[in-house]
């Protein structure tokens, strides 16, 4: 049980000197992590924990996607933009005491890149590596000496440096990978400000401050991630103090949090999208008229009004309006049930059809109430004769099944990883991302879109890239593989005594600077 465990911690804190402050923070969240191997995971709940265990060559600024040094203290790039040389920090150690150096970085990225690497073959594959197109970008990895790591590219790639700050490019302990093998995902070893202590599935993940950290040490002694699926129970535990922070707030509780002097609310425009994907490998969603009909059938404004308390924007594009390259000239598909019925009749379905609507079992940053969203979409579809049965699975199973294309329609979403449109459009909708296990769960395969996205990746000219991404959004709007639903405001709540935590555009949860203040 978590409550006795916390009482012990609180008692120990109280038994110390008068100056000793509470140094264990319990963070409530909607679901448990799937795994803790940064090269394998694709879900936000896993990244939340990995953010605090691992580090990358470069990192994002605490409040933006500007790139800063991390495990590399500096870097150089050749004039042709093909050779990147990273100068590594000395004196950095993994949590198991082994040394971080260029060979360790070569191992960390090499296991994903080199097919003959002894740890390359893993169940499900390195999906982020694949979906970011890293095999098409990289030519070679090299470690000429302990403090120098070199990456050579096949061709210039504009978002490359930003990609290196993402979780899948984190440094992992080669010794730990060799020791644990397939079980490494539940025995993580990185270089970050917190080290792994234990994982009791669906109860808690416990991290402890890394006392041997190379930089300023974390201010918390312990960091506990506690999964609480029910929104009402999560909020109750926050109110009672069993947890001191939580995210993915149910909008119903926003006013209560604002009115409670013991709590603080954090908000930020979300760099995300919640969407309904139609599997184009399955009839009738291989028919453009059907996909457009579904787009016209869903009342997005009602979703925002009823389930977000106004803390969201209606979506018309796959990327949020906070991101450069957004195409505001696109009008979107208006809510029009009559037009939807006419399109279905034209496609040969005058009486509609039966299908399944898959829905997430847990709240997400872009969809804090997926059950209610699914029910509302189901009701909208019924108005045009589409009889959709809602299907749910456990979170990890859900992700596996949709990535393998078992769904006809599925709700999902995305929070941007690096502040680049490429991270939405190429990762979620390019034809290369439709290879199973896929991030492109619409299984949309447009050669026209692919050419535009590849051109945008190669160009170093921001204005040119922006125009190409606007063109890409026009292609996607025409082909309608998704119903883009919402762009949600990012939210979190903490007790008044918690300080130093900042919401990040990528949704990352870094607790390095978080502390309790009197």
Where are these regions (language model features)?
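Append "and occasionally in soluble cytosolic enzymes with long acidic Gly/Pro-rich linkers
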Residues: 206-209, 286-379, 445, 471
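Extracytoplasmic/peripheral linker and loop segments enriched in polar/acidic and small residues
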Residues: 16-18, 304, 383-399, 426-495, ...
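Gly/Pro-rich hinge or "lid" segments in bacterial periplasmic/extracellular proteins
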Residues: 61-62, 156-218, 222, 232, ...
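Aromatic- and charge-enriched surface segment that lines or borders ligand/interaction sites
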Residues: 73-119, 150, 237, 284
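Surface-exposed binding/hinge segments that line
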Residues: 18, 87, 106, 124-174
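N-terminal lobe/hinge region of extracytoplasmic solute-binding protein
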Residues: 28-79, 110, 187-189
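Long beta-strand-rich cores associated with HINT superfamily self-processing modules
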Residues: 343, 492-518
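Ligand-site clamp/hinge motif
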Residues: 182, 210-256, 267, 387
């Amino acid at each position: 049980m978590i409550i006795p465990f916390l009482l012990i911690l609180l008692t120990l804190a109280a038994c110390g000197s008068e100056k000793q402050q509470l140094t264990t923070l319990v963070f409530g969240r909607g679901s448990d992590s799937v795994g803790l191997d940064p090269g394998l995971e694709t879900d936000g709940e896993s990244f939340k924990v990995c953010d605090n265990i691992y580090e990358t060559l470069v990192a994002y600024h605490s409040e933006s996607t500007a790139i800063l040094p991390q495990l590399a203290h500096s870097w150089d790039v050749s004039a042709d933009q093909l050779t990147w040389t990273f100068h590594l920090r000395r004196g950095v150690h993994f949590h198991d005491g082994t040394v971080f150096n260029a060979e360790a970085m070569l191992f960390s990225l090499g296991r994903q890149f080199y097919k003959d690497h002894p740890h390359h073959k893993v169940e499900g594959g390195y999906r982020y590596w694949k979906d970011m197109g890293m095999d098409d970008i990289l030519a070679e990895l090299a470690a000429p000496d302990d403090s120098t790591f070199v990456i050579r590219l096949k061709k210039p790639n504009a978002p490359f440096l930003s990609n290196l700050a993402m979780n899948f490019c984190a440094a992992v302990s080669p010794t730990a990978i060799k020791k644990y093998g397939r079980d490494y995902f539940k025995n993580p070893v990185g270089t970050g400000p917190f080290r792994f202590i234990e994982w009791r599935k669906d109860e808690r993940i416990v991290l402890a401050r890394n006392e041997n950290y190379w930089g300023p040490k974390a201010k918390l002694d312990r960091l506990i991630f506690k999964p609480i699926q029910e929104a009402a129970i999560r909020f109750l535990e926050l109110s009672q103090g069993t947890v001191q922070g939580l995210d993915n707030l149910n909008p119903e509780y926003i006013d209560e949090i604002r009115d409670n002097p013991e709590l603080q609310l954090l908000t930020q425009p979300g760099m995300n999208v919640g969407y309904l994907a139609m599997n184009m490998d399955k009839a009738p969603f291989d028919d453009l008229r059907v996909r457009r009909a579904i787009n016209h059938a869903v009342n997005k404004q009602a979703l925002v009004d009823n389930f977000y308390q106004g803390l969201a924007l209606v979506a018309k594009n796959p990327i949020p309006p906070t991101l450069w390259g957004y195409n505001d000239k696109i009008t979107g598909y208006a809510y029009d049930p009559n037009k939807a019925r006419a399109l279905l009749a034209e496609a040969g379905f005058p009486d509609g059809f039966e299908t399944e609507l898959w829905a997430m079992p847990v709240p997400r940053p872009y969809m804090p109430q997926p059950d209610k969203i699914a029910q509302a979409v189901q009701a909208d579809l019924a108005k045009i004769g589409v009889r959709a049965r809602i299907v749910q699975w456990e979170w990890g199973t859900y992700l596996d099944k949709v990535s393998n294309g078992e769904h006809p329609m599925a709700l999902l979403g995305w929070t941007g990883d690096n502040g680049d449109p490429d991270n939405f459009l190429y990762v979620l909708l390019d034809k290369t991302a439709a290879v199973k296990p896929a991030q492109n769960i619409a299984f949309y395969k447009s050669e026209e879109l692919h050419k535009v996205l590849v051109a945008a990746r190669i160009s170093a000219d921001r204005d040119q890239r922006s125009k190409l991404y606007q063109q890409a959004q026009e292609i996607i709007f025409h082909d309608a593989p998704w119903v883009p639903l919402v762009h949600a405001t990012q939210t979190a709540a903490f007790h008044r005594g918690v300080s130093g935590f900042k919401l990040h555009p990528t949704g990352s949860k870094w607790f390095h600077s978080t502390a309790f203040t009197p």
